[in-house]
UniProtKB/Swiss-Prot annotation:
Primary subcellular site in the record, as a coarse category: plastid
Record-linked InterPro entries: Cytochr_b6-f_cplx_su8_sf, Cytochrome_b6-f_cplx_su8
GO term, biological process aspect, one: cytochrome complex assembly
Family: Belongs to the PetN family.
Gene Ontology CC annotation, any one: cytochrome b6f complex
Name of the protein described by the UniProt record: Cytochrome b6-f complex subunit 8
Transmembrane segments: 3-23
Function field: Component of the cytochrome b6-f complex, which mediates electron transfer between photosystem II (PSII) and photosystem I (PSI), cyclic electron flow around PSI, and state transitions.
Domain of life: Eukaryota
Membrane topology: Single-pass membrane protein
Record keywords, A-Z: Electron transport, Membrane, Plastid, Transmembrane, Transmembrane helix, Transport
SUPFAM superfamilies: PetN subunit of the cytochrome b6f complex
Amino acid sequence: MDITSIAWGALMVVFTFSLSLVVWGRSGL
């Protein structure tokens, strides 16, 4: 596994996490 795929994987995880956090905040949970 090279550094590029590691960086992309981390970016996807952070993006998904922040997106779900925004959805949670707007739901009022």
